[in-house]
UniProtKB/Swiss-Prot annotation:
The gene is cysH. The keyword 4Fe-4S does not apply. This is Phosphoadenosine 5'-phosphosulfate reductase. The keyword Oxidoreductase applies. GO terms for molecular function: phosphoadenylyl-sulfate reductase (thioredoxin) activity. Keywords: Cytoplasm, Oxidoreductase. It holds the Pfam family PAPS_reduct. It is found in: Cytoplasm. Belongs to the PAPS reductase family. CysH subfamily. Its EC number is 1.8.4.8. Catalyzes the formation of sulfite from phosphoadenosine 5'-phosphosulfate (PAPS) using thioredoxin as an electron donor. It catalyses: [thioredoxin]-disulfide + sulfite + adenosine 3',5'-bisphosphate + 2 H(+) = [thioredoxin]-dithiol + 3'-phosphoadenylyl sulfate. The active site is at C239 (nucleophile).
Length: 244
């Protein structure tokens, strides 16, 4: 696999970019997660960043990438509405893994947003999308720009939802390379990695949560529910960071 030219690829239409990366992705599918990270660091341009929501299985990608690339900037977009357990989990993992944490937030505080727009998450899909744009998408775009990122690692997995089922290991999103090292891992592999490396699930895992985001749009799993139905009232799966 040869090195890729980000600028040249960004000039192509989206379909052509996908085709241009197809051969590389076919080879990346054959590598393990560590191999994919190592390949990306050798062949894709820096600066490198890793994003994390510090959700249920976040310790896996945080540990895996940070072991290979210590001090990689870890981007967290903090909405101000995370669970108390999440904030404590962030502190715990940051200390345990010696993370180079970079926290980005909306330019408007949570209270100011509610005063201006009301509770956007109660205003259907359009309200949720506006909320996500303000609290997730804009802060992430700002983070990528300020950190001069050209290669972005994330911990998405195909098993998590229908919207992620066909994602490749390597893509271009927001003008940068996006690498998903554990995209093909199942829940069993996640569990084994956590056990092997002395890592924990998010504290709310033990209380019945399969996915954790904001307090107002996250529900416990109940029999018959798909994982994606536990977020955003089942109206949508993605928070906006991994769309487009």
């Amino acid at each position: 696999m040869s090195k890729l030219d980000l600028n040249a690829l960004n000039e192509l239409p989206k379909v052509d970019r996908i085709l241009a990366l197809a051969e590389t992705n076919a080879q990346l599918e054959k590598l393990d997660a560590e191999g994919r990270v190592a390949w990306a660091l050798d062949n894709l341009p820096g600066e490198y960043v890793l994003s994390s929501s510090f959700g249920i299985q976040a310790a896996v990608s945080l540990h895996l990438v940070n072991q290979i690339r210590p001090d990689i900037p870890v981007i967290l977009t903090d909405t101000g509405y995370l669970f108390p357990e999440t904030y404590r989990f962030i502190d715990e993992l940051t200390d345990k893994l010696k993370l180079n944490l970079k926290v980005y937030r909306a330019t408007e505080s949570a209270a100011w947003q509610e005063a201006r727009y009301g509770k956007l998450w109660e205003q259907g899909v359009e309200g949720i999308e506006k909320y996500n744009d303000i609290n997730k998408v804009e802060p992430m775009n700002r983070a990528l720009k300020e950190l001069n990122a050209q290669t972005w690692f994330a911990g998405l997995r195909r098993e998590q939802s229908g919207s992620r089922a066909n994602l490749p290991v390597l893509a271009i999103q927001r003008g940068v390379f996006k690498v998903l090292p554990i995209i093909d891992w199942d829940n069993r592999t996640i569990y084994q990695y956590l056990q092997k490396n002395g890592l924990k699930y998010h504290p709310l895992w033990d209380e019945g949560y399969l996915s954790v985001g904001d307090t107002h749009t996250t529900r416990k799993w109940e029999p018959g529910m798909a994982e994606e139905e536990t977020r955003f009232f089942g109206l949508k799966r993605e928070c906006g960071l991994h769309e487009g």
